[in-house]
Amino acid sequence: YSDERLPFKGELNRLETNYDRLRLQLFQESPVYDSLLDNDLFPEFSNSFLLLIGREKPEIATVYSKFSNERSPEFSLRTDICKEGKKDRFVRKVPTEATAEKHVRNLESLSREMARIYAKEGLELNQCTLEKQGVRLEFLRGKTLEEHLDALVEQGRNEEAEKLLFRYVEKVRRIHSGEAFYKTPEFVKVFGNVSQEGTLSCSGISNIDLVPANILIDNDRISVIDYEWTFRFPIPGNFIIYRMIHYYLESDGKRRALK
């Protein structure tokens, strides 16, 4: 994070952060983080700081950086929000290991393939272009579906939150209802030889991380902002819906009211 990109309320809700030393864990960390953010105290409680000193100011400044390096090396990457002079911001994803280059560069072709499928349900993808180091994506503004749901829950409008969530669940269901699911060797390699009961629906290409935090709403524009975990083989649509509901409800204790 930086002064130009501090965390949003509700963003700090995970406990498995790679801290540099042992720390005490609170019973309800998310409300504590939200309280710190409301009172502009986040810098006072930050874990560590990075200070860059040099004679020349870089043309492209990094205002936020996230390392996803707890994964296997072939998926390890860094996500930056960058600012180029007075121009608008953009997002850059670069591999942190040579073996992850294929995974990162694959995003550009995935964005084109998924855009055609999602357009049927009024969903867009943030545009992705190849760069020398990795890929460059649009920096989009708006509020995530997760933020909209949280606002309703905090106001006690649980029925409205449920209707909003399931409006998007049905979009996902329709996207993944064009084909009958069957296990491919690629599916078994990733998910194992799981048992199958009954007939399941799917599509030929599947983004399993289509969760509320990755759906951005800006007036009439609805965008999917992270499609890194997309596979070019059939995956049951019900599994994607399960992840969508599970990762929203289980990521923050305040959402238990919807269970």
Question: What positions do the PLM features span?
Answer:
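Short, surface-exposed beta-strand-loop junctions and turns on beta-sheet-rich folds
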Residues: 98-99, 143-144, 230-232
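Conserved structural core of kinase catalytic domains
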Residues: 124-192
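Short acidic-glycine loop/turn motifs at beta-strand connectors
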Residues: 57, 85-87, 218-221
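Extracellular structured ligand-interaction cores
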Residues: 46-50, 134, 205-207, 212
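Short, exposed beta-strand/loop patches in secreted or surface proteins that constitute
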Residues: 78-84, 124-130, 215
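ATP-binding glycine-rich loop module of kinase domains
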Residues: 72-115
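Rossmann-like AdoMet/SAM-dependent catalytic core
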Residues: 2-80
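Catalytic activation segment of kinase domains across protein kinase-like and atypical kinase folds
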Residues: 189-256
